[in-house]
Amino acid sequence: MSRVKRGVTAHAKHKKVYKAAKGFYGRRKNTIRAAKAAVEKAGQYAFRDRKRKKRTFRALWIQRLNAAVRPFELTYSRFIDGLSKSGITVDRKVLSDLAINEPAAFEAIVVKAKAALAA
């Protein structure tokens, strides 16, 4: 059996870790042990925050909608109830965007939701 020297593969592995740790502070960018731990932790944070981002944006859309329907004497929950009763199936992201960029269209939706609540 021939001897296998690991220099090339080890260097390639280290290079991959250092590339991922570029921009990190202190030893975390240039010692392999610290860089490997930092890159792994960064991956954990990235995984966690990809999940968290969905919650954060949904909460933002809800806050925007609540603020947008208040001038029409509605709360967010009553507005959503009115939408479901009137059969309008537009998601919160689109509704939030309409409230900001297309106030006239949003107002028409609010009027329909209000009518469904009154009926």
From Swiss-Prot:
One of its GO terms (cellular component) is ribonucleoprotein complex. SUPFAM superfamilies: Ribosomal protein L20. The gene is rplT. InterPro entries: Ribosomal_bL20, RIBOSOMAL_L20_CS, Ribosomal_protein_bL20_C. Pfam families: Ribosomal_L20. Keywords: Ribonucleoprotein, Ribosomal protein, RNA-binding, rRNA-binding. GO terms for molecular function: rRNA binding; structural constituent of ribosome. The keyword RNA-binding applies. Belongs to the bacterial ribosomal protein bL20 family. This is Large ribosomal subunit protein bL20. It comes from Bradyrhizobium sp. (strain ORS 278).
